[in-house]
């Protein structure tokens, strides 16, 4: 699916609008992504996969871009939204998770013609679609930019994100004395922090902050 963009996008200063709901409230987020910014990520010669487990662990951090200006802008806006609603840390994480979950799930085969093709967060935002890896990198980037501690959770045929949130409950993975609660970025039915599919058990936990 092509993004809903205004006519200025061809000039390199367009915008993409996102709509999602969380806890019965509707949210709108306008994201400005210049063509030059998108193209720089799109044309980056980084390896896009497929990867062995060891390779995947080693390269995950490259795709988490929490210092990117677009990501910083999004994280700031979502933080403001959460403050206005008086959300707790857990609620704030879930608000950001609901945003990423609202982005269309699409397989790499459908979107890139490859079995595996990892995207940078800006690519996923611009294209308004991604698979579990793409959406996990986006969510981890936004959450890290918001000041939380995130890890990538690597499974045999899946990827998710873990976020440290003291006081939270549910499925978590331990690393370095912290509990990272499972976040399913591809869910479509309001799965929140700590809720994980039963089939995913042991994971490679990759620090990306």
Whereabouts are the PLM-identified features?
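Solvent-exposed, polar/charged alpha-helical surfaces in well-ordered, non-transmembrane soluble domains
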Residues: 94, 98, 130, 134-141
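Secondary-structure boundary elements
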Residues: 57-127
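A residue-identity detector for tryptophan
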Residues: 20, 51, 118, 172-175, ...
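Hydrophobic/aromatic-rich core segments of domains that either
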Residues: 134-208
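Linear, non-domain "peripheral" regions
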Residues: 1-72
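Extended, composition-driven regions rather than compact fold-specific motifs
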Residues: 4-22, 66-80, 84-90, 102, ...
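Short low-complexity stretches enriched in small and charged residues
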Residues: 48-56, 115-120, 139, 182-184
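Intrinsically disordered, low-complexity regulatory regions in eukaryotic proteins
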Residues: 8-31, 113, 123, 193-196, ...
């Amino acid at each position: 699916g092509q993004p809903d963009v205004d006519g200025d996008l061809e000039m390199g200063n367009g915008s993409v609008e996102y709509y999602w709901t969380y806890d019965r409230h509707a949210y709108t987020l306008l994201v400005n992504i210049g063509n030059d910014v998108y193209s720089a990520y799109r044309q980056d010669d980084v390896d896009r996969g497929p990867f062995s487990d060891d390779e995947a662990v080693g390269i995950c951090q490259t795709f988490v871009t929490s210092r990117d200006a677009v990501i910083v802008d999004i994280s700031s806006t979502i933080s403001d939204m959460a403050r206005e609603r008086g959300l707790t840390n857990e609620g704030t994480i879930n608000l950001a998770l609901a945003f990423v979950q609202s982005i269309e799930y699409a397989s790499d085969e459908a979107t890139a013609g490859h079995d595996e093709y990892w995207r940078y967060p800006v690519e996923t935002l611009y294209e308004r679609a991604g698979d579990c890896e793409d959406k996990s990198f986006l969510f981890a980037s936004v959450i890290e930019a918001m000041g939380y501690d995130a890890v990538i959770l690597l499974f045999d045929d899946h990827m998710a994100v873990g976020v440290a949130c003291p006081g939270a409950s549910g499925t978590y993975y331990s690393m370095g004395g912290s509990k990272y609660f499972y976040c399913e970025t591809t869910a479509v039915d309001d799965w929140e922090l700590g809720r994980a599919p039963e089939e995913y058990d042991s994971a490679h936990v990759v620090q990306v902050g």
